[in-house]
Amino acid sequence: MGRNDLIRRLPVYATGEHDCPYLDGETACTWFVDPDASLSPGLYSNLIRQGYRRSGRYIYRPGCDACHACQSLRIPVHRFRSRRRHRRCLKANAGATVEPLPSTYREEHYQLYCDYLQARHPGSEMSDPAIGDYLEFLRTDWCETLFYEFRDENDTLLGVAATDLVADGLSAVYTFYRPDLPERSLGTLAILWQINEARRLGLDYVYLGYWIKGCDQMRYKADFRPHEVFNGGRWLTVA
């Protein structure tokens, strides 16, 4: 049985309608693969290629009937062309170092994660994560996840990019970094590193998750060109 057949046989469940977190006035529905289903690195890789996304042990995709604004976006790393702002970012971080680490608990990482969420989501439930929730969100036991650790010239932690290794690329799960250093553009730096790392590993893509045209929170993803979006069951190139 091929992997596409296995995907079609996977039990998938839909949530009820809920407020869309990205588009004001819109409702959303999400399809989740049964978290108790038997998964493997190969099957997960194929789901990523079919426009799915991982959060902890949950694999999901948008399932809205009336709206198809959410599209998976990936960067073909061998065709990627850096722009002036990307080169400025690399210059600003010329002294930074990156080390791939196993996805295990480190107190320094967890504290940075808390600082990042408190800056991005002040006053919300997300801003005070428990240690167990932190690790459950970033990793799972049926795929290989690395924590790419970014440090500055003085060995001070700058950020962490939780990244899944899939068959044809790297999937950016979540990146958190120091919120007090906007001049370094650390989120952009992490993606540029993932692009170069995928090239070094002989992989083809960096998967950045979902993108919505016109959504300010996701605008940065489309800044990496060319990129591809998953639309109508196939990947389409956006130059």
From Swiss-Prot:
What positions belong to coiled-coil segments? none
Question: InterPro entries, alphabetically?
Answer: Acyl_CoA_acyltransferase, Asp_Glu_LeuTrfase, N-end_Aminoacyl_Trfase, N-end_Aminoacyl_Trfase_C, N-end_Aminoacyl_Trfase_N
Q: Which reaction does it catalyse?
A: N-terminal L-glutamyl-[protein] + L-leucyl-tRNA(Leu) = N-terminal L-leucyl-L-glutamyl-[protein] + tRNA(Leu) + H(+); N-terminal L-aspartyl-[protein] + L-leucyl-tRNA(Leu) = N-terminal L-leucyl-L-aspartyl-[protein] + tRNA(Leu) + H(+)
Biological-process GO terms, alphabetical: ubiquitin-dependent protein catabolic process via the N-end rule pathway
Q: Which UniProt keywords apply?
A: Acyltransferase, Cytoplasm, Transferase
Q: Where in the cell is it found?
A: Cytoplasm
Q: Which SUPFAM superfamilies match?
A: Acyl-CoA N-acyltransferases (Nat)
What GO cellular component entries does it have?
Answer: cytoplasm
Single GO MF annotation: leucyl-tRNA--protein transferase activity
Tell whether Transferase is among the UniProt keywords: yes
Role summary? Functions in the N-end rule pathway of protein degradation where it conjugates Leu from its aminoacyl-tRNA to the N-termini of proteins containing an N-terminal aspartate or glutamate.
Q: Which family does it belong to?
A: Belongs to the R-transferase family. Bpt subfamily.
Question: Which NCBIfam families does the record cross-reference, listed alphabetically?
Answer: PRK01305.1-1, PRK01305.1-3, PRK01305.2-3
Name this protein carries in UniProt:
Aspartate/glutamate leucyltransferase
In the UniProt record, the gene name given for this protein reads: bpt
